[in-house]
Amino acid sequence: MYAKVYQYKFPGISEAKVAAAYCSDKLGQKIDEHNFHGLGILISQEGDLTIWIKFDDVAKLKAFNKDADQFVHDLKTSFVFKENKYVGIYVYNY
């Protein structure tokens, strides 16, 4: 199992809520196209937004990366935030 994880820090929870709705819409449209195994979007009270997208194999993750660049670009032109992203392999998942 592979995952693409985005971590964003917004000025406050209000901005994170708006961004979460935007991300839910944009990424939700990509579920069938890229055959996501899972999609999770979390918000903290401090304005953190975490998005994880699970893939069954690395080929699907690499195929999504092409669309991911446009998604991140659109997000950056619409919102102010700090970004941390990485690709990981699930070591343990229940």
Residue spans for each PLM region:
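Short S/T/G/P-rich N-terminal loop/turn motif that feeds into the first structured element of a domain
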Residues: 1-49, 54-67, 83-94
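C-terminal structural segments of small proteins and small subunits
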Residues: 71-85
